[in-house]
């Protein structure tokens, strides 16, 4: 009988974790009380029961409800101390799940009004990351993400800012929010600015919309990675293209089910992507709202898709290779994966 190893001890990289969505439920409730923020009852009741709220974002009404909960949680982050707490706790949760490298995704414009402006907000976040790296030992960097529901000119401003802070811990540029709003090509100039500044291109695509949105990310934004990308499984030619170019898809199985992209964990096409040779980096997306963190995604691959420990190890390797980690860090993590397999 094959030995079943603990996936929380498997060294890995975490490439798809949103800033506010990384918060512990207990932290959210404490910060809401601290700042006098009244959270939606659906959120407080679910978290009070130790559950995640019931979500489904496959239509605009469902997405609006999801965004409302997310915005309410974000409103509880009001001081540099709140930011530091969130970043440190996100790192602690990742370390507990075996992550040695975390790229946390944030749109600093969302925090600017409470933190003194756009530049102070990003600097506070980067300072928190630097302190957390020093205190915990985790490798951690920031991916700055534009909001596709805002004007493309805003994205260009954000891209320039991201490049300016590339030496302070920004490693990539993304595009998030509802894929059904705004065309990828509208943001091509922002991504060109980011690429010219040496940042990874990691836009969202292939989650709420089909394979066409993944193609748009490749064609218009020259994506190095795709946030989600799971709907590429519906197009064999696109799968081959992703595999040939070794574009990493940041697949978030629990999130896909929670938002109604797929009905059940076994419906998420992990096996199809894996066998097509598409690199994947499993991610937790928004644990606050979806109720599961990084190691749980590997458990889904094992329990619902029959991934062996050797295959789980390869998933971990793919996450490391797809990261912006320095080669020395990648080498250490990859060696750790090999050790996990022979232990």
Curated annotation (Swiss-Prot):
Family listed: Belongs to the metallo-dependent hydrolases superfamily. Adenosine and AMP deaminases family.
Identification of the protein by name: Putative adenosine/adenine deaminase
EC numbers, comma separated: 3.5.4.-
Phylogenetic lineage: Bacteria, Bacillati, Actinomycetota, Actinomycetes, Kitasatosporales
InterPro entries reported in the protein's UniProt record: A/AMP_deam_AS, A_deaminase_dom, Ado/ade_deaminase, Metal_Hydrolase
Record note on cofactor: Binds 1 zinc ion per subunit.
Top-level taxon of the source organism: Bacteria
Active site: 207
Functional summary from the UniProt entry: Putative nucleoside deaminase. May catalyze the hydrolytic deamination of adenosine or some similar substrate and play a role in purine metabolism.
Alphabetical keyword list: Hydrolase, Metal-binding, Nucleotide metabolism, Zinc
Important for catalytic activity (site feature) positions: 228
PROSITE patterns the record matches: A_DEAMINASE (PS00485)
Record-level Gene Ontology MF annotations: deaminase activity; hydrolase activity, acting on carbon-nitrogen (but not peptide) bonds, in cyclic amidines; metal ion binding
Catalytic class of the enzyme: hydrolase
GO biological process, one term: nucleotide metabolic process
Binding site for Zn(2+): 16, 18, 204, 285
Organism annotation: Streptomyces coelicolor (strain ATCC BAA-471 / A3(2) / M145)
Binding site for substrate: 18, 286
Gene3D superfamilies given in the database record: Metal-dependent hydrolases (3.20.20.140)
Cofactor: Zn(2+)
